[in-house]
């Protein structure tokens, strides 16, 4: 007995020394692993590991497995909380449930919350819940690959690695994918239905489908793209490798971009406009064209005033000397005109030539008046007169 007590004291002394030197984390208690071969339900907090084989493990809404569930066939139905799942096992993560770390290579259905998931499979992951980070790795099969059905909910970061084999397919039908990055020679196939927005799209991504995907942040594809499913905003930063061409839609117009290095669509295909007066002594820009960049389909306006002793005739016209857009001139009155240019251009400095305003003329005083009758003969109804030199209206 005395020897046992001395041995126990020695063990305690060693533990105390380890804790003092390395802290309590250095002392690890290995929990028991529970083998599950028949359908089982967990309804309490449990820090043990579970090994599930060809059966169903259900974690109820009050259940919380803080350890790891290893799978070899069978199904996990989670209504509560699980720390980690690893292995070949189907996972049904229901609404209100959570999984911290999911490492599975069989079918996954998520309507709850998953912090991190790594999916190396030829099966299907269907999401209508929330996944912070989803990593999809192609195991290298040439005839099958993983499928991600994005029906609703959110995936903040979706990362695909595929160097060989069939491309993983991402069916984007609903919800929000914030970022998609595809690494590897083959990359991923993104099939879009409906209209969606994504902040970042990078790597080898083949976009197709019947919908429109608008990239609002960063668009950086490794290959060219000539489809009709990609859109951008004025704030999208594009990078296109030399030798590649991508087509993007902005404001219902398609642009072909052949080279770009972290540039916005306004820098790559934007337009400017200016008006050049033939004789600046005859008019003044009350509201000139702004110096901003305009895109195809947008309109720029300006207002010009005739100077004193000048006016704009009713048939006043201006000419677009550089540009393919349309120019509309509205004569507000004899002193003021409005210019409206609608761009049908890309990467063009539009120029508009403004002819000089017309000088006003003064009628000679009438001659040959007799008998004190002060009138002018020969006046017709087509003639107009102004009440003063500065009058804006004619009668």
What are the language-model segments listed below?
Residues 31-269, 367:
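Extended beta-solenoid/beta-helix repeat architectures
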Residues 21-33:
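Sec-dependent signal peptide cleavage junction
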Residues 268-296, 352-375:
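Extracellular ectodomain segments of secreted/surface proteins
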Residues 307-313, 376-384:
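Short proline/glycine-enriched turn/loop motifs at strand-loop junctions of beta-rich domains
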Residues 227-229, 253, 301-332:
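Surface-exposed interfaces of beta-sheet-rich extracellular modules
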Residues 12, 251-254, 259-267, 332-355:
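Extracellular interaction modules
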Residues 11-23:
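Bacterial N-terminal signal peptides
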Residues 1-12:
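Bacterial N-terminal signal peptides that target proteins for export
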């Amino acid at each position: 007995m005395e020897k046992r007590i001395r041995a126990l004291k020695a063990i305690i002394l060693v533990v105390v020394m380890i804790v003092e030197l390395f802290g309590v984390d250095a002392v690890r208690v290995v929990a028991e692993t529970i083998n599950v071969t028949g359908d089982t339900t967990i309804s309490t907090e449990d820090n043990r590991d579970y090994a599930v084989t060809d059966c169903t493990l259900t974690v109820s809404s009050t259940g919380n497995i803080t350890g790891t569930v290893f799978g070899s066939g069978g199904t996990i139905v989670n209504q509560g909380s699980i720390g980690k799942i690893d292995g070949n096992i189907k996972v049904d993560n229901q609404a209100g449930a959570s999984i911290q770390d999911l490492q599975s290579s069989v079918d996954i259905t998520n309507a709850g919350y998953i912090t991190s998931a790594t999916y190396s499979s030829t099966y299907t992951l269907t999401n209508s819940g929330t996944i912070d980070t989803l990593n999809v790795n192609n195991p290298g099969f040439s005839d099958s690959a993983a499928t991600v059905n994005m029906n609703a909910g959110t995936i903040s970061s979706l990362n695909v690695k595929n160097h060989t084999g069939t491309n993983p397919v991402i069916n984007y039908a609903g919800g929000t994918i914030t970022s998609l990055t595809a690494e590897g020679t083959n990359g991923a196939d993104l099939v879009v239905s409906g209209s969606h927005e994504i902040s970042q799209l990078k790597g080898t991504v083949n976009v197709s489908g019947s919908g429109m995907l608008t990239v609002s942040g960063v668009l950086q594809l490794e290959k060219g793209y000539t489809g009709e499913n990609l859109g951008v905003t004025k704030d999208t930063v594009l990078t296109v490798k030399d030798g590649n061409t991508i087509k993007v839609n902005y404001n219902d117009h398609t642009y072909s971009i052949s080279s770009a290095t972290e540039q916005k669509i306004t820098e790559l295909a934007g337009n400017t406009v200016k008006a050049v007066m033939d004789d600046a002594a005859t008019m003044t820009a009350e509201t000139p064209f702004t110096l901003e960049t305009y895109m195809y389909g947008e309109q720029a306006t300006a207002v010009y005033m005739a100077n004193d002793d000048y006016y704009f005739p009713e048939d006043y016209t201006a000419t677009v000397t550089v540009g393919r857009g349309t120019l509309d001139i509205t004569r507000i009155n004899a002193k003021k005109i409005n210019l409206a240019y609608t761009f049908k251009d890309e990467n063009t400095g539009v120029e508009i030539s403004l002819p000089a305003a017309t000088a006003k003329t003064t009628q000679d005083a009438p001659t040959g008046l007799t008998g004190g009758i002060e009138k002018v003969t020969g006046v017709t109804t087509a003639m107009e007169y102004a009440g003063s030199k500065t009058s804006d209206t004619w009668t």
